[in-house]
Amino acid sequence: MKKLTDKQKSRLWEQQRSVNFQASCLLEKGKGPAEPDIEMLELGPSAPGLPHLCLIHRHLFRNEMKGAGELRTADISKGDIPFCHFEYIEKVGNELMASLESDKYLVGLQKEEFTDRISHYYCEINMLHPFMSGNGVAQRIFFEQLAIHAGYVLNWQGIDPDDWAAANQSGAMGDLTALNVIFAKVVSEARESA
């Protein structure tokens, strides 16, 4: 895989962000931010961390959510699945980001290994669920940017929202098989012509 320059990565992000954002919101069954101003969201750093995820969330929801980009201060769950206890979000989130850093932000991996690792980290950050709402869209943008820096693109178009929800539910129970299948469809190698 040929490594992209920073300029090529930025152009690729500019080409992908709007279309991908719309498809990402469909996975939330239309529950995305009302005024995200996605065109103004720059490609983040090649070494993102929890503060960058917070920045993405703040950018997306600043016009409609008090405390956008701030870590939640109450426990939440989805059905029977509890997310990380709010008092541990920062600690666990920073540990996850340190692990991602140890994995070199997934740079240099072949597609199959990249797919496995991004599924793992997506599931872990999903279980962290650092914000009161808007986690899914913010996470997907975070991982879209991570993928670009690693030489891949993510394309959420054509992913069924119910399949996505079921895959995330299975991941929460420790089975990443369905997430791996979806990410195998979503991930493709970034092209130099971007």
PLM features per residue range, with description:
Residues 1-194:
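FIC/Doc superfamily catalytic core
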